Amino acid sequence: MGDIRTFVFAIEDTETTQGLCKTIGRSSSFDQNSLCKPYNLYFDEPELSRQHAVLCIKTPIPKIEGVPSIEQLRICIRDLNNKTGTVNLVSDGPNDEIDLKNGDAFGLIAIDNHPFRDNHHLAAKLIFRIELEYFDEAREIVKCTITNVTFGKNNTVSSFPIHSATSTEDSDSSWYGLSEASTQTEVADECHETNTILTRGGRFSILSLRKRGSKQDQKICSNFDRKIHETSSFEEEIEVCTDTDTTEEKEEEEEKEEGDDEEGEIELEIIRVKRIKGRTKIKKTLTCFSKNKKIITPQHSNSMWLLLIVILIFDRLLSN
């Protein structure tokens, strides 16, 4: 599935001469009012015109007694492009003004015999389904959902972007009381009313949408993050270790002893043997010690003994 656009409106706003109208067109980054947002009908499609078509929802006058108001709503798509900009997918009627029912689909950007797969052909580059449902039946507030179903039947992901549910863009309430909560583009599991507002179009309810994430998806993400963490730790360990040919050496400890003051600084390369998965690793670090401390290693100790022996021999020779 592709984009999901959602907005709410009051049925009394459809009882005017023109009804409820919403522009369909190409999004533009230069105009804040025509940016691609989850509560409008502007799309990132270069073949669309700036004002490609218009969605009209209207209640016929006079109203029919005994019939629910939502069932009397007339849905119409009018072409503003005059270049086969809209496509009638539900009947053989004209393409420039398409009458729809709740749940019907319509097309944008007509194409001739465009092959898709399995001998199927697309009549339009973009196909949308429109659905109306009560959000608050007592107050006659309706929720309109328009879904991109261009490749839905063929299990092919649409190429159009899906808005993030954590969008930080300011909500535009100029479209008949649209609330910020209704800008969520993903399908919500819960929807309830939190407040009621009044606009120039009438009274409207503020939507509050809640989405429960899939436990399976959360589990997959958790396992993936854990694998990444383990891989990163292993790579860091590889960088500081070098393989050796021995497999049974034990970890050696550095022996540090304090001695007399000595001028200058001593640079000493400390070798740490570390066993990893049955193989011995050696970690090398270059350490710089101050002149106030003296570290004696086995090699240094042997040198001192040799020096002491040489001094004793030299002293014996002098005494003779």
From Swiss-Prot:
InterPro entries: FHA_dom (IPR000253), SMAD_FHA_dom_sf (IPR008984). Gene3D superfamilies: 2.60.200.20. Residues 22-86 form the FHA domain. It holds the Pfam family FHA. Residues 242-264 are annotated as: Disordered. This is Uncharacterized protein YGL081W.
